[in-house]
Amino acid sequence: RKDGEKLKLTGEKVGHEGAFTPGNGWQEVRFATPVKGRYFCLEALSPQANDNIAAIAEFDVLGADGKPVSREHWKIRYADSEETRSGNRTADKIFDLQESTFWMTVDNVAYPHQLVIDLSKVETVTGFRYLPRAEKNYPGMIKEYRVYVKPADFKY
């Protein structure tokens, strides 16, 4: 992640798009067609609540066998916003195996929000699992989203 970078998704192929159901607990999304790639971008298009915040407690990418791929060597390549004023809400919290920690965007940065994960190697991606914050009214829960998966990094 570099200060001042801005992700450019114009012209990129959308791998999947949809909407999450409001509520707590894991949500699993399966792609109609598997996609090979090393860079996984989740673009949050709108919130469940009427605010600017996006938050993710934990996140898995599903591999060829339909099971989560190893997160051991993952890195956050890009996050458009991270809340660090009121807490340590950096994007790497989405794969720290702690459901009580989470990534959260700054409240004055409007949607859409983007997060790019470097999976460290090319994987056959068949879907993903998303865990919103486990609190009353699931603050920061994403509603509509798009996913992009590529073997090479995105443009910034």
Give residue ranges: language-model regions.
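Compositionally biased low-complexity segments at domain edges in trafficked proteins
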Residues: I76-D80
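Solvent-exposed serine/threonine-rich low-complexity stretches and specific carbohydrate-binding patches
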Residues: T10-F20
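Aromatic, loop-rich ligand-recognition surfaces of beta-strand-rich domains
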Residues: R1-L9, P22-H73, E83-Y156
